Amino acid sequence: MNNSNLAAARNLIQVVTGEWKSRCVYVATRLGLADLIESGIDSDETLAAAVGSDAERIHRLMRLLVAFEIFQGDTRDGYANTPTSHLLRDVEGSFRDMVLFYGEEFHAAWTPACEALLSGTPGFELAFGEDFYSYLKRCPDAGRRFLLAMKASNLAFHEIPRLLDFRGRSFVDVGGGSGELTKAILQAEPSARGVMLDREGSLGVARDNLSSLLAGERVSLVGGDMLQEVPSNGDIYLLSRIIGDLDEAASLRLLGNCREAMAGDGRVVVIERTISASEPSPMSVLWDVHLFMACAGRHRTTEEVVDLLGRGGFAVERIVDLPMETRMIVAARA
């Protein structure tokens, strides 16, 4: 086998075995290894005793996770957390909830991937016998865990109040989920006022997350269906990771609701992972296929979002790149 074929084989093997790595990260997170190590339980023997396993098996797991720089150290000198493993801890701002939800519900959704791509039925529906949002509605604990998972991955939200002027303005966070975007804006701009809309059964996490702001009457939570109506007279309507879950007709209906409800000089702001039409990044197209597996959603190209806004009666004013393959697209009434 020549060098070219060896490189191709190595690349293929790395891709095919990628799931094994993610499963080991999931196991470490489910067992709480990062928290145990932070507390000083840092050897194979003590970790095994803490989780009810065997030192040799824990050693093999930790050896793999150290090799991929999730943790550092060894059983002789003790394991230690890295910036990556700190994200697995059960603390505010970690990725723990995201890793667990991805490693459970979303892992199951990808299992029937071949059947899903052949039939057009999302993998989640094939795995669970119902669509994603029906499952979340039927299982409140899963709904809560999903919102916490989404909260963990909202790395772009703290950029929004820096890029948009919220001084003395009112905004509507449509489908605001955990309330993390609303919280970021209100903490950054004391004169702003917010309304967060989501399904009635989904407001519990946001209520906890925004408790101090609710007490100060700077924000109100509204339960309802965004495809029926949205709160009126807002200056800014935020659609963060919403239209990726919606088909064309539903997206246009939502944009129409926002256009009808907003103040005269209002803006709609789409915050969405978009795909470059000319050079799609690996992560953006991976997220796109994941959206199909989860809920029959899709990530559009930036040009497709601009076109969608135009057909919804809006003219795009600016497009800003954000972290994690995300773009902010600001539009006014056309």
Curated annotation (Swiss-Prot):
Among its keywords, does the record have Methyltransferase?
A: yes
Q: What does this protein do?
A: Involved in the biosynthesis of pyocyanine, a blue-pigmented phenazine derivative, which plays a role in virulence. Converts phenazine-1-carboxylate (PCA) to 5-methylphenazine-1-carboxylate (5-methyl-PCA).
- An example Pfam family from this entry, by short name, is Dimerisation
Pathway annotation from the record: Secondary metabolite biosynthesis; pyocyanine biosynthesis
Q: How does it assemble?
A: Homodimer in solution. Probably interacts transiently with PhzS.
Free-text domain note: Contains an N-terminal dimerization domain. The C-terminal region contains the S-adenosyl-L-methionine binding site.
List positions binding S-adenosyl-L-methionine.
198, 241
What family does the entry list?
Answer: Belongs to the class I-like SAM-binding methyltransferase superfamily. Cation-independent O-methyltransferase family.
Which GO terms label this protein's molecular function in UniProt?
5-methyl-phenazine-1-carboxylate N-methyltransferase activity; identical protein binding; O-methyltransferase activity; protein homodimerization activity; S-adenosyl-L-methionine binding; S-adenosylmethionine-dependent methyltransferase activity
Q: Which reaction does it catalyse?
A: phenazine-1-carboxylate + S-adenosyl-L-methionine = 5-methyl-phenazine-1-carboxylate + S-adenosyl-L-homocysteine
Regulation of protein activity: In vitro, requires PhzS for activity.
Protein name per Swiss-Prot or TrEMBL:
Phenazine-1-carboxylate N-methyltransferase
Q: Write down the EC number.
A: 2.1.1.327
Which GO biological process categories is it annotated with?
Answer: methylation; pyocyanine biosynthetic process
Q: State the top-level EC class.
A: transferase
Q: Where are the transmembrane segments?
A: none
Tell me yes or no: is Transferase among this UniProt entry's keywords.
Answer: yes
What InterPro entries does this protein's entry cite? COMT-like, O_MeTrfase_dom, Plant_O-MeTrfase_dimerisation, SAM-dependent_MTases_sf, WH-like_DNA-bd_sf, WH_DNA-bd_sf
Q: Keyword annotations for this protein?
A: Methyltransferase, S-adenosyl-L-methionine, Transferase
